[in-house]
Structures are given as structure tokens and as C-alpha cells.
């Protein structure tokens, strides 16, 4: 089995962050990303790049981090208790994009690499990541295209890869207290190492490189759609689900907070504006009801 090489992974992640930011700036056409580099007392650091108040994107954050620690946190060992007490090295790129126009979906993507060390033992390493889409006023063609892009990038790695990671995404981005998915899904994978380092790294790269290929056409198609106060209010209400999921369930958020990570970078996934409304129910037959009735439950899209 090929040995893990954190150096090449880090180089890819830094380049990926740069390319995604450049692509988003081109889509926005007005605003640019501000870079904010930081260091972590316990070891490591990163660069957060944030775009605010653009023509298309209300806020977009693309974060690179590379951190080390003396002991794996509870969030990382809950499903792998044999790793408790190991030192660790974690690196990744994580992004969340909150568009202005309610007809453009919010999206999230992440690719990451972990190594857990223990004296006298082989290092335990794995890749994880994925991307998912959260529309407010969904269009079926957009969702199908999104999933087709996900399926296309998975295809070279086997016929079973897309269905497996699509299902995992539906299960992971689910809010039990709301009994609904966070959005229309995409891909989610974790603990990837069975095929060896090179092939596992190839797949992680395919996911990272495939994100903008999947998202950019949807932005281009919807960015000039007219909207009013009603659509904006619903967008802000639905953004509340994003906050609920990230603060209550998301393993990445919990990992960052439990390892003493940089709070500003961890919480840059939060939308800049959001609202809650008591006992909201969309009117039957409305565009808002269409989201609940047809999109917030797992479906086969391709």
C-alpha cells in the first residue's frame, strides 16, 4: 500500500483554494476575496478567504487549514474509539457560499485529510469530503444537473461510488428535529483509505476539482432571475436550517470548536442574515411548499 504524503495533499489544497476563489470572483464580477491568515497556538494554522457584499454572493468563505494536536478530539473518535489519545494532523479546504438571489442555491463543499499518529504504530490516515446543494426555490433541471456532475466524477472510480456517497450525503445532511434534509444532497464520504493513498487521493482531488464544474452553471442560469421581498424573506427563513444543522450536528464544526480552532474561520459558514418564524407553514400549492413537498426528502435524481 502506498504511503501517505501530507506534503502533496497540502499543495493540492492550497491550489484548490486559489482556483475556487478565482472562479467565484469571476462569477460575481464585482467583489473579491480578502485573505486572513492565522496561526494556532497548539500547532498549525491556515488562511480564511472571505468575499462579502458582492453582486452575486452575499457572503462566500473558502477556508484552508492545517492543524496538529496532541490528542484526537471526541468528535473525531466517536465513531473510531481506537484512535482516542493519538496525536493528529488535519488539513482541508472547506467552503460555504450564500448567494444574494434566492433562486441561486446555497452550497457547501469540503475536502480533507487526517493522519493519526501513535509511537510504535503505523499512522492511521484517511480522506473525507463532498459537496451538497441547498436550494430555496429549486429547479428540477438544476438538481439533476448537479447530481449528474457528481455521478460523472465518481464514475471512473466504480459504478457503486456515486450511489454509495449520494446516500451517505442524504443521511448526513439531515435534521432529525425537523424531519427533513438540509437540501438536495450531493456527495459525502469519510474514512477513505481502503484503495491505498494514491487512489484515495485521486478521488479526493476529483471531488474538489468537480465542485465548481457542478455549481457554476447553476449560478449563471439563475443570477439574473427577478425576486422580491417574499422570496427574500423565505430565503432568510430557510437559512435558519443551515444554522441549526451546523451548530447542532455538523462534525466539522464540532471538531473545530473542540480542538480550539479559530472561531471566526469555523463559523464563517454562518449566513450573514437569517430569520426564524414561529410555526411557519407554507401555503399549499405555493412555490415555497414545492420545496417541502418535493425536495427535502431523498430522491434519485439521475
Curated annotation (Swiss-Prot):
Active site: 108
Compartments reported by the entry: Cytoplasm
A cellular component term, taken from the record's GO annotations: cytoplasm
Gene3D superfamilies: Coproporphyrinogen III oxidase, aerobic
Binding-site positions, substrate: 94, 110-112, 260-262
Binding site for a divalent metal cation: 98, 108, 147, 177
Family to which this protein belongs: Belongs to the aerobic coproporphyrinogen-III oxidase family.
Subunit structure: Homodimer.
Name listed for the protein in its UniProt record: Oxygen-dependent coproporphyrinogen-III oxidase
Species this chain originates from: Shewanella oneidensis (strain ATCC 700550 / JCM 31522 / CIP 106686 / LMG 19005 / NCIMB 14063 / MR-1)
Amino acid at each position: 500500500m502506498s504511503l501517505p504524503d501530507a506534503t502533496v495533499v497540502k499543495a493540492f489544497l492550497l491550489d484548490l483554494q486559489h482556483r475556487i476563489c478565482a472562479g467565484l470572483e469571476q462569477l460575481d464580477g464585482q467583489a473579491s476575496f480578502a485573505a486572513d491568515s492565522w496561526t494556532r497556538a497548539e500547532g498549525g494554522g491556515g488562511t480564511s478567504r472571505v468575499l462579502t457584499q458582492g453582486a452575486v454572493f452575499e457572503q462566500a468563505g473558502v477556508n484552508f487549514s492545517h492543524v496538529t494536536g496532541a490528542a484526537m478530539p471526541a468528535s473525531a473518535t466517536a465513531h473510531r474509539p481506537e484512535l482516542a489519545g493519538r496525536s493528529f494532523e488535519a488539513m482541508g479546504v472547506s467552503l460555504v457560499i450564500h448567494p444574494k438571489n434566492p433562486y441561486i442555491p446555497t452550497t457547501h463543499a469540503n475536502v480533507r485529510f487526517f493522519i493519526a499518529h501513535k509511537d510504535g504504530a503505523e499512522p492511521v490516515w484517511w480522506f473525507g469530503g463532498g459537496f451538497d446543494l441547498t436550494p430555496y426555490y429549486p429547479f428540477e433541471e438544476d438538481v439533476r444537473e448537479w447530481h449528474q456532475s457528481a455521478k460523472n466524477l465518481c464514475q471512473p472510480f466504480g459504478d457503486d461510488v456515486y450511489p454509495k456517497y449520494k446516500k451517505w450525503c442524504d443521511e448526513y445532511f439531515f435534521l432529525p428535529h425537523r424531519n427533513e434534509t438540509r437540501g438536495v444532497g450531493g456527495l459525502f464520504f469519510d474514512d477513505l483509505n481502503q484503495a491505498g493513498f494514491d487512489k484515495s487521493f485521486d478521488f479526493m482531488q476529483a471531488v474538489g476539482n468537480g465542485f465548481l464544474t457542478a455549481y457554476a452553471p447553476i449560478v449563471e442560469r439563475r443570477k439574473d432571475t427577478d425576486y422580491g421581498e417574499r422570496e427574500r424573506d423565505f430565503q432568510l427563513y430557510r437559512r435558519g436550517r443551515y444554522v441549526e444543522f451546523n451548530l447542532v450536528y455538523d462534525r466539522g464544526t464540532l471538531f473545530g470548536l473542540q480542538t480550539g480552532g479559530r472561531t471566526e474561520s469555523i463559523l464563517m459558514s454562518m449566513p450573514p442574515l437569517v430569520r426564524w418564524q414561529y410555526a411557519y407553514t407554507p401555503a399549499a400549492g405555493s412555490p415555497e411548499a414545492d420545496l417541502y413537498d418535493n425536495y427535502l426528502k431523498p430522491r434519485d435524481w439521475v
